[in-house]
Each structure stands twice: as C-alpha cells, then as structure tokens.
Amino acid sequence: FTTQETITNANTAKQWFLKSAKDSKFVANHFVALSTNAKLVQEFGIDKANMFEFWDWVGGRYSLWSAIGMSIALNIGFENFEHLLSGAHWMDNHFKSTPIERNIPVILAVLGIWYGNFYGAETQALLPYDQYMHRFAAYFQQGDMESNGKYVVRAGDKVNYSTGPIVWGEPGTNGQHAFYQLIHQVPHHPCDFNSPVKSHNSELRDGLHHTILLSNFLAQTEALMKGKDRQTVEKELKAAGKSEDEIKSIGPHKEFTGNRPTNSIMVDTVTPFTLGAMIAMYEHKIFTQGIIWDINSYDQWGVE
C-alpha cells in the first residue's frame, strides 16, 4: 500500500467499483489485501479479516513464496502452488546440504564471478528453449540486478570491482534470429541455456516442434563451445561451389573462435515443481554472489 503503481491501480479499481456499489462500506466485502500494513489496509476500506499478511522483511523479488503468491495459487490452483513451493524447498535443501563442489547454485555463482570479475563479462543471458518460460529472463532481471547491482559493500565503502551483471534474454529460436550473432562472434557474454526434455505439446506433429527446439538447443551450445575455424569454413564453401575469390571474401565473416561460456540446464518437463526449483536455484546463486562480493542482496536503495 506504499508502492505507487500498486496503490494507483487499487484506487482505480475502487473508483470503478464504487460507480456501481455507490457506498464505500461495500469495499470491505469485495476487496482483499496482501500487505504488511494493517493500518493502511483499513484506511483503504478493506476488512482486516480479509488481509493476508507476510513479514515486512520479505522483499518483492523474493515474495512469491509468501502470501504474495496468492495470485499464482488462484491461477494454477493451490495444489500446483504447493508443488511450486515443494520444488523450491527441494532446491533449498540441496543448497543447504550439498558439498560446494556439487552445489548447483554455488557453481553458478562462482562461474558468474569468474566470468565477470576475471574476464570482464558485464552481461548474463538467460535463454529458455520452451515458450512457457518466455518471461523467465525478464523475471530475473529484477531478481538479479536489483539484488546485486550495488555501489557499496555492507559496511558502506564503495566497491572497487564489478558486482551484478546486466541480465537479458529471449526464448528459444526467437533469440537466434535476434542476437545470437553477437554471442557467437563477440566474446564475454556468458549464457545459461535451459530446456525441458519433454514438451507439453508433444502431440503437435508427433513432437516435431520440440525436436527442432532441442536440436537447436544442443547445436547452439556446441557451436558456442567449438566455434568454426577458417579451414572448416573454406572446406564448406568449396563444397558449396564457391570460387577461390568468393571463399577469400566470405571466409573471414563465417569464422568464429568458439570458447564462449555457456551452462546447459535441463529438466524432464516444465512443471510447478521444476519451475520452483529453478527459481530457487537462481535465488541462491544471487545470494551466494552477494556474500562473496560483500554486498547486501536484500536491499534496493537505488530504487527507493
């Protein structure tokens, strides 16, 4: 009730409602609140009995596991919401108890620091090969950049090293037709590829669509790793019937060095459980990086 966008929307909805209801006393029966501030909830006209509370230390970008997740539960059903929580809980336990050399969030965290602080990478691409996850990168733009894009360490001293990367990305082959040119031929843009093994739409042309997506997923990561040297390029152009002059002219543009850093993250199927685990995985990765950088991943003074 103190966030400008949220309260503006709420007041607009209230105004629309009162055009028909005529009496503000009916707001109490037709609105519910998710808030930490009982006083402002009641001033708005909502019955405190219809207020779903959560702790005031829960930041927005980590709040979906709390009562704030009600909109998710209403959309997918509470049983599925519990599966989402269970997936996150599984990852919590993995993060808590697995030795660091096999700890997925820790490995992701130190790889990000290795690329960013030692190789000068300033971005991190999240590339889901499943349309159901098309907003995954956008979700973690806030999760990562608002958490670790910090100017000072915990004690208030100015940092003298890079902290959070710029997070970006698009799903599947959409990105291939937009920016893969850059990640193949320009260094220092680490990428996380993620994909389910099985599709929810396997009945479409006997699974052809997902087979194509998976083929692209595997081919892109292999190409980013191996690259293509001049000798291979020239051999391909010669086989295509190009003249020596054409090979000499075109060859340099088709060469790329490889050794581009990627992570391949796969799940059996995108479900509430696996999605919850993946979200928690990145949350713990962000936390781990914040600890190593000695910054507070849970404030956002730059926003405030």
Swiss-Prot record:
Top-level taxon of the source organism: Eukaryota
EC number: 5.3.1.9
Subcellular location as annotated: Cytoplasm
Gene Ontology annotations for the cellular component aspect, listed alphabetically: cytosol
Catalytic residues (UniProt): E146 (proton donor), H177
Reaction equation(s) it catalyzes: alpha-D-glucose 6-phosphate = beta-D-fructose 6-phosphate
Single GO MF annotation: monosaccharide binding
Keywords: Cytoplasm, Gluconeogenesis, Glycolysis, Isomerase
This protein's pathway: Carbohydrate degradation; glycolysis; D-glyceraldehyde 3-phosphate and glycerone phosphate from D-glucose: step 2/4
Main location: cytoplasm
Enzyme class at the top of the EC tree: isomerase
Single GO biological process annotation from the record: gluconeogenesis
PROSITE patterns on file: P_GLUCOSE_ISOMERASE_1, P_GLUCOSE_ISOMERASE_3
Matches recorded under InterPro entries: G6P_Isomerase (IPR001672), Phosphoglucose_isomerase_CS (IPR018189), SIS_dom_sf (IPR046348), SIS_PGI_2 (IPR035482)
Family listed: Belongs to the GPI family.
UniProt protein name: Glucose-6-phosphate isomerase
Organism of origin: Calanus finmarchicus
